[in-house]
Amino acid sequence: MSDRLEDSALMLRYRDGDVAAFEVLYGRHKDSVYRYLLRLALDAQVAEDVFQEAWSRIIRARDQYRPTARFSTYLFRIAHNCFIDHVRRNRRHAGAEELDAEKMPATDDEPDRVTERLLARERLGVALMNLPPEQRDVFLLREEAGLTLDEIASVTGTSRETAKSRLRYAVGKLGTAIAGNGQAPKRQSGESTA
């Protein structure tokens, strides 16, 4: 066994009172969970609020934790549910914040390359905002969280085939949008969000 303890073993240790085990888990997963929520919520304040709530739920529910799935699946399910709860409470959420070029890290790349990357990132952000929420969620669970289709299905409460279909539609729409003008095709009335 490697020196790196499995996440589920760390959570079990935390359940038994080992706070240092929780600190390791938090350190491993905080960035990916926050990125997932930020891209899902499209609002930094909402993402931060939901992020805090998700970790609070992990802490409060530690005595009930059972390692029936990967810890990351458990964690992203809680984060997903916290976001859904937030949306239900607020019935709306704001759009993404504008990219601030001054916050971007400096690079030694040629200015044209930097500009090209910034524009591509902006097109991706716009395209993500234009995806139906179900497709955006599945895409982010795959790309940000690195979950498998089975894990995505578990997190979203859908079948594997539904998760696969939503991912396929999302990737197709994002590819079209990034190659084109940055706008994901708008849904037609009656179009499935599969």
Regions found by a protein language model. Give the residues of each.
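Short, basic/polar amphipathic helix motif occurring as a linker/hinge flanking DNA-binding modules
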Residues: 86-107, 115, 183-187
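DNA-recognition helix of helix-turn-helix
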Residues: 73, 80, 84, 135, ...
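N-terminal module of bacterial RNA polymerase sigma factors
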Residues: 1-32, 129, 151, 190-194
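C-terminal edge and immediately downstream basic/flexible tail or linker adjoining helix-turn-helix-like DNA-binding
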Residues: 2-3, 13, 42, 94, ...
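Sigma70-family region 2
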Residues: 15-16, 39-42, 53-70, 89-90
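Hydrophobic-face residues of short alpha-helical interaction/recognition segments
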Residues: 33, 37, 62, 75, ...
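Amphipathic, Lys/Arg- and hydrophobic-enriched alpha-helical face
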Residues: 26-44, 61, 128, 173, ...
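Short, charged helix-capping/linker segments at alpha-helix termini
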Residues: 15-24, 34-53, 160
